[in-house]
Swiss-Prot record:
It is found in: Nucleus. Component of the 17S U2 SnRNP complex, a ribonucleoprotein complex that contains small nuclear RNA (snRNA) U2 and a number of specific proteins. Part of the SF3B subcomplex of the 17S U2 SnRNP complex. SF3B associates with the splicing subcomplex SF3A and a 12S RNA unit to form the U2 small nuclear ribonucleoproteins complex (U2 snRNP). Within the SF3B subcomplex, interacts directly with SF3B1 (via HEAT domain), SF3B5 and PHF5A. Identified in the spliceosome A complex; remains associated with the spliceosome throughout the splicing process. Component of the spliceosome B complex. Residues 1100-1123 are annotated as: Interaction with SF3B5. GO terms for molecular function: nucleic acid binding; protein-containing complex binding. GO terms for biological process: mRNA splicing, via spliceosome; negative regulation of protein catabolic process; positive regulation of DNA-templated transcription; regulation of DNA repair; regulation of RNA splicing. Its main location: nucleus. The lineage of its organism: Eukaryota, Metazoa, Chordata, Craniata, Vertebrata. One of its GO terms (cellular component) is nucleus. This is Splicing factor 3B subunit 3. It comes from Mus musculus.
Length: 1217
């Protein structure tokens, strides 16, 4: 078995975010890392929408990311620390839309090791040097400079190693143009290591160490080191030189401290806490991330606590000495992994979990009522300040980037009866969790919908003048009339436009600079800017059946297949070409391309005929109306559309930006198939046809504009958009009802919209999330969802949600009540009334936990609910709250053979589980009966067990439960579940159970799979085979009777199969005659499974399912990852295909090595050598390579570049999208 890996949705969780001017213009951009992906985002300063410019897989782990700019430069570069053992400097090239690797310096081994640098990066604020550090011992400094041609140069590394030292954080200190300086949080463990009593370990202090790079001596000196009172977790650089006092802020538990060289005394300020917080008051508070904003006249920091509260931090200075730190509560946003304050006044928040946000900073919070806390305020040691959290005041949310991270569980099923299956994804963490329903398609936002007096048959938009940015009219054609609407603040009917209203319209367009043309069955109407009208009438009894129009040309087809061609002359007059062309059959459809910039006309006309052919006809004056080429079609054409797509932006001599693309002829057939063919711009030849089935109706095509480029809207029983995005073609369905006719639409509110008709309504639509594979509907949940099952009859979901370090609703209410009573008791006689009012206000206050976070209850505190949800509407049908410290870990829905048709839900619950050091007071299996057509849970009984029941699976009318490391069969009893049989030989802890026939495949938490056979006659569970590798299995899926696919904690997927000669009729040998080694107890079972495939995904996979994703497609193995990625593994059906893709992968490894310097083969073999899997993500980078490299690779394969692209596209569309 050979598999091909494809990513459907890239990871969405963000681990690092940096901002700068990476394209060299004044625009602010953000570069984010998503594990093994680098992405460049650009927030639009006018609309606030975030656009993705570029996404690159780096096939390595990005451990750190920094932006820097050389002194006096205008462009920011990106430094990447990864697991490749190399430092890489990247530059963004806007003309090619790619990251270019400028430098790659090797300094150590690959992999995330503790003494190989790459974990921390720090840059001198003036861009003169960069320090790259490991977690332990090694630090290297590189000097950055320019050569004579103004190219960036990098020195050889200077060492600043210190053995036996752990590093917690590194930053560059702003010292102006003095010698560059770096500050590190370090801890020396040498004494602690050598002291057997443990005293030294208890007394070890963290130190703040400054390293200076002496540019004169080309040497790094350890300048200064001092011990810290509290344990710091990160550092913030304070602007220096002419901008500020320099130095660093140390964020530590409960305190923020300012430190600098020389006479500067330490200034420290406690971190304010929330008033009346339900958290444990003994728990420390830390800052988790920060952002700095600096202008010529001032600077401030925004720092976020682990509850999500942002504080604005300012420093008061007296000359060059800092005298106080001031903190002011700013706003509360979800806890972030990184924050960026952009110069355009935006705050980008990359959330740790869940969606990411872009906020506009509306106020700086200087002049409001909020109290300001200062280091100068007197406080007792151990006391702190208190503040009151509130909804957003200084920030305004302008955009939200959907993120599925973390996906904890996923099932694929067509519960909504839509033919195409939906993905039901349990994602998020704590109160920000959600169940999301993903459907393949682009999200459509409805701008306006209005009823029309009848059912129209077509719609167009036209501009009044070629220079206009927005459309002026919408023209709607009915069976016997034409309606003209003007576009302004509102859309209203106009009568003086010059259009003929008493006839249907076949087409209309802007002609020349400022004239309009209307083609109707009896003729052509040319309306000049001064409302003069020229008419051309059809000869005799003939009428116009089809037409094609662009800015300068009109072609019409009369009944009987006669073509008449008109072209506009320089005076703006429409002139008929002297000859007419008789076609051999009736014309069904026609298309002209837009006139290319700087040319007189479009050279080609495409005509589709009844005889199942498309013909390309020249419109060049030298051979006008001569046929150039022809393509036979599998069915009759319905519509044609010539577009220029896939262009790269180029600047001409005058600095005008234009794009040079390829001409594509799109052909929509009557059988619902879309063909895309390349049209040669010189000869008119047609080549390289791609085919996709779109739906059951004939396909109509319309040209629209998306992100400044031409795109094609194709309408069948579903509407599809074909567009080029990040140098790849996408053909994606719209998640919207069926449309009948459409046209591009541009107005002030909606610069790139679509106007469309559906039955008797006119709709204005916008597509904002181009490039998105899925559109999603999210239903909020209360705690982190762990698993869910689908009730087969009602299609409802039964979800278990469990959170550690959390209170149940009942405990929360009880704690609040208790705190309110304490408030009243603590008040003196005269303050009783006020205290009672405050207590009442506190009890009524309800800040949403999805924004303000849930209170942290402490270790060993658990909260759980069991929820029954309707997956289509998303409403909760039933909710069972478990008691405090009961944690639900497993759920199953099953029938028992002795109870007939009733369905039961079993939930495995742990009691008082402490994770480290692990201890548990036991567990329960709750049994519920599903009543009310699967909408309500009726409690039957609970069965006590000794350990955590972490896996439950229905099995032959009974149920299998993994209790710790015991595998048991239970049956339903009146008072509890009855134990029928057990096996004690599983190694550690059962994390999953799959069943097929009499076989049971058990996943162990760290010992891979164990095959068990149930013998009904002897009522025994007998182990007959296992795996030879230790795998920390997270999820598994059966592929057939002998084969199982599994994923582990470290990001690998494997497929394991039992050899054909495996015998599962083994006995436990009650006689004892068998030799000891035959039993195989020393090294597991006597029979071993074979590994068929191994592959390192690079993200922890938490669900696997064998399913089909598109109607009529083949089966594939779909996986989802903790980082929010969704991918598939698909089997090759022929040896030729496998051989071809193996060669593509081999050539790309050498021709197009990964961006951050990691070797592709060793990345995919991180833990086990990659076996029988070809990496489709690498193969698909073929399309983004430079044309000459594409040519070299395809020549090696004896193909042309379009043929290779077509193979890549075909394998993707056969299984997915």
């Amino acid at each position: 078995m050979f598999l091909y890996n494809l990513t459907l949705q890239r990871a969405t969780g963000i681990s690092f975010a940096i901002h700068g001017n990476f394209s060299g213009t004044k625009q602010q951009e953000i570069v984010v890392s998503r594990g093994k992906i680098l992405e460049l985002l650009r927030p639009d300063p006018n609309t606030g929408k975030v656009h993705t410019l570029l996404t690159v897989e780096v096939f390595g782990v990005i451990r750190s990311l920094m932006a820097f700019r050389l002194t006096g430069g205008t462009k920011d570069y990106i430094v990447v620390g990864s697991d490749s053992g190399r430092i890489v400097i990247l530059e963004y090239q806007p003309s090619k839309n790619m990251f270019e690797k400028i430098h790659q310096e090797t300094f150590g081994k690959s992999g995330c090791r503790r003494i190989v640098p790459g974990q921390f990066l720090a840059v001198d604020p003036k861009g003169r040097a960069v320090m790259i550090s490991a977690i332990e011992k090694q630090k290297l400094v590189y000097i950055l400079n320019r050569d004579a041609a103004a190219r960036l140069t990098i020195s050889s590394p200077l060492e600043a190693h210190k053995a036996n030292t752990l590093v917690y954080h590194v930053v560059g200190v702003d010292v102006g143009f003095e010698n560059p300086m770096f500050a590190c949080l370090e801890m020396d463990y040498e004494e602690a290591d050598n002291d057997p009593t443990g005293e030294a370990a208890a007394n070890t202090q963290q130190t703040l160490t400054f390293y200076e790079l002496d540019l004169g001596l080309n040497h790094v000196v350890r300048k200064y080191s001092e011990p810290l009172e509290e344990h710091g977790n990160f550092l913030i650089t304070v602007p220096g030189g002419s901008d500020g006092p320099s130095g660093v802020l140390i964020c530590s538990e409960n305190y923020i401290t300012y430190k600098n060289f020389g006479d500067q005394p330490d200034i420290r300020c406690p971190i304010p806490r929330r008033r009346n917080d339900l958290d444990d008051p003994e728990r420390g508070m830390i800052f988790v991330c920060s952002a700095t904003h600096k202008t010529k006249s001032m600077f401030f920091f925004l720092a976020q606590t682990e509850q999500g509260d942002i504080f604005k931090i300012t420093l008061e200075t007296d000359e060059d000495m800092v005298t106080e730190i001031r903190l002011k509560y700013f706003d509360t946003v979800p806890v972030a992994a990184a924050m960026c304050v952009l110069k355009t006044g935006f705050l980008f928040v990359a959330s740790e979990f869940g969606n990411h946000y872009l906020y506009q900073i509306a106020h700086l919070g200087d002049d409001d009522e909020e109290p300001e806390f200062s280091s100068a305020m007197p406080l007792e040691e151990g006391d702190t300040f208190f503040f009151q959290p509130r909804p957003l005041k200084n920030l305004v949310l302008v955009d939200e980037l959907d993120s599925l991270s973390p996906i904890l569980f996923c099932q694929i099923a067509d519960l909504a009866n839509e033919d195409t299956p939906q993905l039901y994804v349990a994602c998020g963490r704590g109160p920000r969790s959600s169940l999301r329903v993903l459907r393949h398609g682009l999200e459509v936002s409805e701008m306006a919908v209005s009823e029309l007096p009848g059912n129209p048959n077509a719609v167009w938009t036209v501009r009044r003048h070629i220079e206009d940015e927005f459309d002026a009219y919408i023209i709607v054609s009915f069976v016997n009339a034409t309606l003209v609407l003007s576009i302004g603040e509102t859309v209203e009917e106009v009568t003086d436009s010059g259009f003929l209203g008493t006839t249907p319209t076949l087409s209309c367009s802007l002609l020349g600079d400022d004239a309009l043309v209307q083609v109707y069955p009896d003729g052509i109407r040319h309306i000049r800017a001064d409302k003069r009208v020229n008419e051309w009438k059809t000869p005799g009894k003939k009428t116009i059946v089809k037409c094609a129009v662009n800015q300068r040309q009109v072609v019409i087809a009369l009944t009987g297949g006669e073509l008449v061609y008109f072209e506009m002359d320089p005076s703006g007059q429409l002139n008929e070409y002297t000859e007419r062309k008789e076609m051999s059959a009736d014309v069904v459809c026609m298309s002209l391309a837009n006139v290319p910039p700087g040319e007189q006309r479009s050279r080609f006309l495409a005509v589709g005929l009844v005889d199942n052919t498309v013909r390309i006809i020249s419109l060049d004056p030298s051979d006008c109306l001569q046929p150039l080429s022809m393509q036979a079609l599998p069915a009759q054409p319905e519509s044609l559309c010539i577009v220029e797509m896939g262009g790269t932006e180029k600047q001409d001599e005058l600095g005008e930006r234009g794009s040079i693309g390829f001409l594509y002829l799109n052909i929509g057939l009557q059988n619902g198939v879309l063909l895309r063919t390349v049209l040669d711009p010189v000869t008119g030849d047609l080549s390289d046809t791609r085919t996709r089935y779109l739906g059951s109706r004939p396909v109509k095509l319309f040209r629209v504009r998306m992100q400044g480029q031409e795109a094609v809207l194709a309408m069948s029983s579903r509407s599809w958009l074909s567009y080029s995005y990040q140098s790849r073609f996408h053909l994606t369905p719209l998640s919207y009802e069926t449309l009948e006719f459409a046209s591009g639409f541009a107005s002030e509110q909606c610069p790139e919209g679509i106007v469309a008709i559906s039955t008797n309504t006119l709709r204005i639509l916008a597509l904002e999330k181009l490039g998105a594979v899925f559109n999603q509907v999210a239903f909020p949940l209360q705690y982190t969802p762990r698993k869910f099952v689908i009730h087969p009859e009602s299609n409802n979901l039964i979800i278990i949600e469990t959170d550690h370090n959390a209170y149940t609703e009942a405990t929360k209410a009880q704690r609040k009540q208790q705190m309110a009573e304490e408030m009243v008791e603590a008040a003196g006689e005269d303050e009783r009334e006020l205290a009672a009012e405050m207590a009442a206000a506190f009890l009524n206050e309800n800040l949403p936990e999805s924004i303000f976070g849930a209170p942290k209850a402490g270790n060993g505190q658990w909260a759980s609910v069991i929820r029954v949800m309707n997956p289509i509407q998303g409403n909760t049908l039933d909710l069972v709250q478990l008691e405090q410290n009961e944690a639900a870990f497993s759920v199953a829905v099953c029938r028992f053979s002795n109870t007939g048709e009733d369905w039961y839900v079993l939930v495995g619950v742990a009691k008082d589980l402490i994770l480290s050091p692990r201890s548990v007071a036991g567990g329960f299996v709750y049994t519920y009966k599903l009543v009310n057509n699967g909408e309500k849970l009726e409690f039957l009984h609970k069965t006590p067990v000794e350990e955590v029941p972490a896996a439950i699976a229905p099995f032959q009318g009974r149920v299998l439960i993994g209790v710790g490391k015991l595998l048991r069969v239970y049956d339903l009893g009146k008072k509890k579940l009855l134990r029928k049989c057990e096996n004690k030989h599983i190694a550690n802890y059962i994390s999953g159970i799959q069943t097929i026939g009499h076989r049971v495949i058990v996943s162990d938490v760290q010992e891979s799979f164990i095959w068990v056979r149930y013998k009904r006659n002897e009522n025994q569970l007998i182990i007959f085979a296992d795996d030879t590798y230790p795998r920390w299995v997270t999820t598994a899926s059966l592929l057939d009777y002998d084969t199982v696919a599994g994923a582990d904690k470290f990001g690998n997927i494997c497929v394991v199969r039992l050899p054909p000669n495996t015998n599962d009729e083994v006995d436990e040998d009650p006689t004892g005659n068998k030799a000891l080694w035959d039993r195989g107890l020393l090294n597991g079972a006597s029979q071993k499974a074979e590994v068929i495939m191994n592959y390192h995904v690079g993200e922890t996979v938490l669900s696997l399912q064998k399913t089909t994703l598109i109607p009529g497609g083949s089966e594939s193995l779909v996986y989802t990852t903790l980082s929010g990625g969704i991918g598939i593994l698909v089997p090759f059906t022929s040896h030729e295909d496998h051989d071809f893709f193996q060669h593509v992968e081999m050539h790309l490894r050498s021709e197009h090595p990964p961006l951050c310097g990691r070797d592709h083969l060793s990345f995919r073999s991180y833990y086990f050598p990659v076996k029988n899997v070809i990496d489709g993500d690498l193969c698909e980078q073929f399309n983004s390579m430079e044309p000459n490299k594409q040519k070299n690779v395809s020549e090696e394969l004896d193909r042309t570049p379009p043929e290779v692209s077509k193979k890549l596209e075909d394998i993707r569309t056969r299984y997915a999208f």
